[in-house]
């Protein structure tokens, strides 16, 4: 892994002549100590930093150069303001500045240390000193404390204590600074075990804020797991316990090998380079690699490629580096734990077998050469971990030996017959994911086992849809699948919790999950390529033909159910028949729905909501019914209409309604209306229409969730641009439209149903119902259509480009056309689409709206003015008009 990085790193740097560094501040005369002159000097220095970086200077040298420059500036100002005349006072660098690490926008944290409180005149002088630094636009954090205050505040606050531990003298009273150092490194100031525990807890809390992974697609270079803070934590703990001030000194104390020191240096160098570049493209301090910055940073680092390739290559390097930092951090903190807290020497390790023993609840090697001599023993260890619930992790020295052996493997572990048997045995065991596959991934053993896995480690996709890298997403799919075996998951995923225990071979589902995205980033259809990979894997791992074909089908079709449920008209019997023909059996259907739900949930935590759950349940049960009925037997649509009407009538009779009036309303409705609404929906509409003047518009907002969302029913004289007006108003109200059923009865009255959600995926808040109902009523009663005011897209969306694509799906009818639209998500999109339909005199009969990150992938069911499918010329015009209306290059 490290060799691959070094090759990439050298290829992106093209050294030029490094410019001469500007004059140091210690040479400035008194006449230059003013805000204007100093600001010019600082600007020159910042320009030099950027030029030197572009010319190939290392981030390490430039970070040190800025720290040195600021040191000299502060010393010059210290003299200028006469602080040398104040006895027993010192200026001390703390934080990152204390470590001598100042990136272009890093804060400059200083401590004005004194033996006793400063008097009013001295305090005023300090204030003038700090004010000048602020006027120079330096981000200065400062504190003014006596020695006693430093110690008291340090004892009370871990952050203050950490700053003091890495403090560095700039100028002033050296004896006072050394006195402070003596106190903070004494046994009474944050004893080593206490400091260690506090820093570990602090790190755990920080990791939790980032969902426990560095694989978020907009990571914080400093604070995300595996980032620079994880290296700092190691340095802080070593500094407090051993007095070590560098990684080199940690090697001297025997708690870091030369190879580990080199690896941490390599990781830090890479992270510094990215952070330095980020600071050069930002106007103010920030360490987050947000989407809108990633391309600029990648270009500054000279990553090459078409489109998003530079970003994806840079981020792949980044994620691989943070993986390595994370593994080293975890292992070394364990080693510190052993050194600092010293496990009870009287507690002897308990043998598990000839090769492994248990130290507390951690598995440990009995012979440190075992992994090198017998690589298959690596798999034996993970097999023991999945079988023995006492084992909670791997002992630190064993992790060290595992890392060493991993780097010396001559061939993938899957080429060893015993390793293959053990891998399949692991998959078949309950708890395989949490107790074996997750730690195997954490320690890069999955990569060592199957080379294909290495290709997706750190593989990101530059979009707003996928929240994690491909490997992290896959691990989360596996974890979600395993959770379906837990009854506690039932409230969130009732169908999957019911089906998962009924799967005859759940290990096949885990195998499909492992391979479902394995071919991403290779080019071509990743589903087909992944299916080919898993067939080869199945053959060498001894799966029979039936098992191999099932897993390959799941990989090839892992998107089928999601696409069908969210982007097809699943109330159309033909769609259900086509889907059922592909699925073929109830067993395959059960496997597929579990994989689909896990895949959606693991793609982005915000994607799963009650709407998607209802769609998948509806598709599952409709398919199950079709499979049980037999593929040759189509549902009787007339019988379904009759059944829906009778059930709705039964509900309405409980309200003593006027059945003659009801018959008059229903007699004017076409069959599609009854087919596409449930009896409860039909009764709800009728109940309000019977109590309403049917010549006037009506807007209803359901109080109960319908298919996971809020149903809005609109009754209004049909007219051009009605859909556009409704969609525009919903957009103004920040409603997310997910489904629309558009009907016009025989009297020309529109009977339109919309399923809407709040932006967070929840049903519409009750306190918004009245305002939205009134707003929609006003929108549909306006005499002339008023196009919605064009709003700017969100800042995130502005950095993505999605070409507008229009296609027409094959259809079984000559009465409807099915249009599939892909475009950049943008404010007012549905209203603009509706305007185009109205301009071309097309009638909309239904819509299924899917927003996938920055993309919309929508389905519209259309007919022309003669209630027929669109002819080729109309299709051509429609495609042209939609492309013009939605082209992301248009000004908005």
Curated annotation (Swiss-Prot):
Residues 1-351 are annotated as: Uridylyltransferase. Residues 470-592 form the HD domain. CDD domains: ACT_ACR-UUR-like_2, ACT_UUR-like_1, HDc, NT_GlnE_GlnD_like. Keywords: Hydrolase, Magnesium, Multifunctional enzyme, Nucleotidyltransferase, Repeat, Transferase. Its cofactor is Mg(2+). Residues 352-710 are annotated as: Uridylyl-removing. One of its GO terms (biological process) is regulation of nitrogen utilization. Residues 711-792, 818-892 form the ACT domain. The keyword Nucleotidyltransferase applies. Uridylyltransferase (UTase) activity is inhibited by glutamine, while glutamine activates uridylyl-removing (UR) activity. It catalyses: [protein-PII]-L-tyrosine + UTP = [protein-PII]-uridylyl-L-tyrosine + diphosphate; [protein-PII]-uridylyl-L-tyrosine + H2O = [protein-PII]-L-tyrosine + UMP + H(+). Its EC number is 2.7.7.59, 3.1.4.-. Gene3D superfamilies: Hypothetical protein af1432. GO terms for molecular function: [protein-PII] uridylyltransferase activity; phosphoric diester hydrolase activity. InterPro entries: ACT-like_dom_sf (IPR045865), ACT_dom (IPR002912), HD/PDEase_dom (IPR003607), HD_domain (IPR006674), NT_sf (IPR043519), PII_UdlTrfase/GS_AdlTrfase (IPR013546), Polymerase_NTP_transf_dom (IPR002934), UTase/UR (IPR010043). Belongs to the GlnD family. Modifies, by uridylylation and deuridylylation, the PII regulatory proteins (GlnB and homologs), in response to the nitrogen status of the cell that GlnD senses through the glutamine level. Under low glutamine levels, catalyzes the conversion of the PII proteins and UTP to PII-UMP and PPi, while under higher glutamine levels, GlnD hydrolyzes PII-UMP to PII and UMP (deuridylylation). Thus, controls uridylylation state and activity of the PII proteins, and plays an important role in the regulation of nitrogen assimilation and metabolism. Has four distinct domains: an N-terminal nucleotidyltransferase (NT) domain responsible for UTase activity, a central HD domain that encodes UR activity, and two C-terminal ACT domains that seem to have a role in glutamine sensing. This is Bifunctional uridylyltransferase/uridylyl-removing enzyme. It comes from Serratia proteamaculans (strain 568). The gene is glnD.
């Amino acid at each position: 892994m490290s060799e691959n990085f070094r090759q990439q790193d050298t290829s992106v740097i093209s050294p030029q002549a490094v410019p001469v560094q500007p004059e140091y501040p210690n040479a400035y005369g008194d006449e230059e100590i003013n805000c204007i002159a100093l600001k010019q000097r600082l600007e020159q220095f910042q320009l030099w930093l950027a030029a030197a970086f572009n010319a190939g200077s290392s981030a390490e040298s430039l970070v040190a150069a800025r720290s040195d420059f600021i040191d000299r500036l502060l010393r010059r100002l210290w003299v200028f303001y006469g602080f040398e005349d104040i006895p027993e006072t010192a200026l001390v660098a703390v934080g990152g500045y204390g470590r001598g690490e100042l990136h272009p926008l890093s804060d400059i944290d200083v401590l004005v240390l004194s033996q006793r409180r400063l008097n009013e005149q001295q305090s005023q002088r300090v204030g003038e000193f700090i004010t000048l630094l602020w006027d120079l636009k330096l981000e200065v954090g400062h504190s003014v404390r006596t020695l006693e205050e430093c110690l008291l505040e340090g004892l009370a606050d871990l952050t203050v204590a950490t700053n003091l531990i890495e403090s560095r003298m700039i100028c002033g009273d050296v004896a006072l600074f050394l006195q402070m150092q003596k106190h903070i490194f004494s046994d009474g100031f944050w004893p080593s075990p206490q400091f260690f525990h506090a820093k570990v807890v602090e790190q755990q809390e920080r990791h939790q804020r980032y969902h426990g992974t560095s694989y978020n697609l907009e990571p914080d270079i400093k604070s995300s797991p595996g980032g620079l803070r994880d290296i700092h934590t190691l340095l802080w703990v070593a500094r407090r316990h051993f007095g070590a001030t560098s990684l080199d000194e940690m090697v001297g104390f025997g708690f870091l090998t030369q190879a580990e020191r080199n690896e941490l240096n390599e990781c830090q160098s890479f992270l510094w380079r990215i952070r330095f570049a980020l600071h050069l493209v930002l106007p103010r301090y920030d360490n987050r690699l947000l989407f809108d910055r990633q391309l600029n940073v990648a270009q500054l680092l000279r990553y090459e490629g078409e489109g998003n390739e530079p970003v994806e290559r840079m981020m792949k390097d980044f994620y691989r580096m943070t993986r390595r930092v994370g593994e080293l951090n975890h292992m070394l903190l364990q080693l510190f734990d052993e050194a600092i807290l010293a496990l009870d020497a009287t507690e002897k390790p308990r043998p598990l077998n000839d090769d492994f023993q248990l130290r507390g609840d951690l598995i440990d090697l009995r012979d440190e050469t075992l992994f090198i001599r017998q690589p298959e023993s690596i798999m034996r260890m993970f097999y023991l971990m999945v079988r023995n619930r006492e084992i909670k992790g791997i002992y630190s020295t064993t992790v060290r030996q595992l890392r060493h052996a991993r780097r010396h493997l001559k061939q993938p572990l899957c080429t060893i017959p015993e390793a293959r048997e053990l891998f399949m045995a692991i998959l078949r065991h309950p708890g395989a994911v949490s107790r074996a596959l997750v730690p195997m991934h954490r320690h890069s053993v999955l990569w060592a086992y199957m080379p294909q896995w290495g290709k997706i480690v750190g593989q990101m996709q530059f979009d707003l849809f996928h929240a994690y890298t491909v490997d992290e997403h896959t691990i989360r799919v596996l974890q979600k699948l395993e959770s379906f075996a837990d009854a506690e998951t039932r409230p969130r995923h009732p169908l999957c919790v019911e089906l998962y225990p009924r799967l005859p071979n759940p290990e096949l589902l885990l195998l499909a999950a492992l391979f479902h995205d394995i071919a991403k980033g290779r080019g071509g259809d990743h589903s087909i390529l992944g299916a080919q990979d898993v067939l080869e894997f199945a053959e060498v791992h001894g799966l029979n033909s039936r098992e191999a074909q099932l897993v390959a089908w799941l990989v090839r079709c892992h998107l089928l159910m999601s696409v069908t449920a969210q982007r097809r008209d699943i109330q159309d019997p033909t769609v259900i028949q086509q889907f059922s023909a592909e699925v073929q059996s109830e067993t395959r259907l059960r496997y597929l729905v579990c994989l689909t739900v896990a895949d959606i949930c693991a793609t982005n935590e915000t994607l799963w909501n009650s709407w998607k759950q209802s769609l998948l349940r509806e598709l599952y049960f409709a398919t199950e019914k079709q499979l049980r009925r037999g593929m040759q037997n189509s549902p009787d649509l007339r019988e379904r209409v009759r059944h829906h009407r009778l059930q709705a009538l039964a509900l309405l009779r409980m309200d003593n309604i006027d059945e003659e009036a009801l018959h008059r309303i229903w007699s004017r409705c076409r069959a599609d209306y009854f087919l596409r609404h449930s009896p409860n929906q039909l009764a709800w509409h009728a109940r309000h229409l019977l109590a309403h003047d049917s010549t006037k518009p009506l807007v209803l907002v359901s109080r109960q969730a319908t298919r996971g969302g809020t149903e809005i029913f609109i009754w209004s004289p049909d007219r051009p641009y009605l859909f556009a007006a409704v969609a525009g108003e919903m957009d103004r109200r920040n409603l997310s439209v997910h489904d629309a059923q558009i009907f016009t009865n025989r009297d020309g009255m529109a009977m339109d149903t919309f399923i809407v959600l709040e932006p967070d995926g929840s049903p519409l808040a009750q306190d918004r119902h009245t305002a939205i109902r009134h707003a929609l009523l006003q929108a549909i009663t306006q005499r002339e259509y008023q196009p919605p005011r064009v709003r700017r897209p969100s800042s995130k969306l502005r950095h993505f480009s999605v070409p507008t694509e229009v296609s027409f799906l094959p259809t079984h009818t000559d009465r409807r056309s099915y249009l599939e639209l892909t475009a950049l998500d943008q404010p007012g999109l549905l209203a603009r689409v509706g305007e185009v339909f109205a301009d071309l005199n097309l009638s909309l009969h239904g819509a299924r709206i899917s927003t996938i990150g920055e993309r919309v992938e929508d389905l519209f069911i259309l007919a022309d003015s003669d209630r027929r499918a669109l002819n080729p010329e109309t299709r051509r015009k429609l495609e042209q008009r939609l492309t013009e209306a939605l082209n992301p290059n248009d000004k908005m």
